[in-house]
Amino acid sequence: MPVDKNLRDLEPGIHTDLEGRLTYGGYLRLDQLLSAQQPLSEPAHHDEMLFIIQHQTSELWLKLLAHELRAAIVHLQRDEVWQCRKVLARSKQVLRQLTEQWSVLETLTPSEYMGFRDVLGPSSGFQSLQYRYIEFLLGNKNPQMLQVFAYDPHGQARLREALEAPSLYEEFLRYLARFGHAIPQHYQARDWTAAHVADDSLRPVFERIYENTDRYWREYALCEDLVDVETQFQLWRFRHMRTVMRVIGFKRGTGGSSGVGFLQQALALTFFPELFDVRTSVGVDGRPPQGAPDAAQG
C-alpha cells in the first residue's frame, strides 16, 4: 500500500465495469434528488440553498417516521409487542435526528434570511402534509387542517384516511383491552376523527400497570416507549419554535400564522396525556410500586 503517497489503491475486487448495471447513484436516484434544490432568488442568494436542503431533508426523515409509525400501528393490531417496540425505538431516533438538525438552520441569521424570504410567498412549513399526517397518526387530530390541503386532492385524501382511522395511542388502548385491562368500551369504536383528550377513566388502568411492573412488564415497557416518542416530539417542536424565534423574531409566518406564538401553542398539545398524568398518582396511597421483572421475564 503506497502510504507514502497518501493514497490507497483500488482493490482488485472493486467493481468498475458498471455500464448498464445498478449503481449507487442509480439506486438512490441521485440525479433527481440532487437536482431538486432550485433557489428562486435572483441572483441566487447563498443561504437559500441551506434553507431548501434543511426542509427537504426534514421531509425525508418525516417520510421514514410515518413509515415506522404505520408499522407500529400494524404490530399493535397483531399483538406483536417486540416488533412494535423495535419500530418505536427507531422512530425516537428519527425524531432525535430531526431535532438536532435545527442547529444547522440556526446558523442562518435574520439579515441573511430576509435576503430571500420574499421569494417564498405564502409557502410555509405549516403546509407540510407529512407533518400533519404524523400528528394524526399520533392522535393530534384536527379536521380543520384538511382545509389547508384543498389544493391537493390526493394529499388531502391521504390525510383524511389518517384522520378517520384509529391513532397509535388508540390502537394501544385496544391492545390493552384485549389483554384484560379495563379500557372503557367506547375506545373499541368511536369517532376517530376527534382528538384524544385526557380521560380520567383511563388513569386506574395505568396506575395498575405502573404499580405492578413485574406483572405487566410488556404493557409498562410499551407505555415508556410511547413516553419516549412524545418527549422527543415535543423537544422537536420546542427546538423548531426557538429556531424560528432566533431567525425572524416575532414576525408573522409566511403562511399567515402569528409565527412564534402559533408554534408555542403546539407545545401544549399532547399525544398520550394519561401516560404523563399517571406519574403524579403512582404510589401516593403508600403502596410502593412492584419492582421490575428478573432477566428471564424481560
From Swiss-Prot:
Enzyme Commission number: 1.13.11.11
Pathway: Amino-acid degradation; L-tryptophan degradation via kynurenine pathway; L-kynurenine from L-tryptophan: step 1/2
Binding site for substrate: F51, I52, I53, Q54, H55, Y113, R117, T254
Record text on cofactor binding: Binds 1 heme group per subunit.
Annotated keywords: Dioxygenase, Heme, Iron, Metal-binding, Oxidoreductase, Tryptophan catabolism
A GO MF term: metal ion binding
InterPro entries, per database record: Trp/Indoleamine_2_3_dOase-like (IPR037217), Trp_2_3_dOase (IPR004981)
Record-level GO BP terms: L-tryptophan catabolic process to acetyl-CoA; L-tryptophan catabolic process to kynurenine
Residues that hold heme according to the record: H240
Pfam families named in the record: Trp_dioxygenase
Cofactor: heme
UniProt enzyme class: oxidoreductase
Catalysed reactions listed for this entry: L-tryptophan + O2 = N-formyl-L-kynurenine
Family named by the database record: Belongs to the tryptophan 2,3-dioxygenase family.
HAMAP family from the UniProt entry: T23O (MF_01972)
Main function: Heme-dependent dioxygenase that catalyzes the oxidative cleavage of the L-tryptophan (L-Trp) pyrrole ring and converts L-tryptophan to N-formyl-L-kynurenine. Catalyzes the oxidative cleavage of the indole moiety.
Oligomeric and partner information: Homotetramer.
Name of the protein in question: Tryptophan 2,3-dioxygenase
UniProt organism field: Xanthomonas euvesicatoria pv. vesicatoria (strain 85-10) (Xanthomonas campestris pv. vesicatoria)
Source taxonomy: Bacteria, Pseudomonadati, Pseudomonadota, Gammaproteobacteria, Lysobacterales
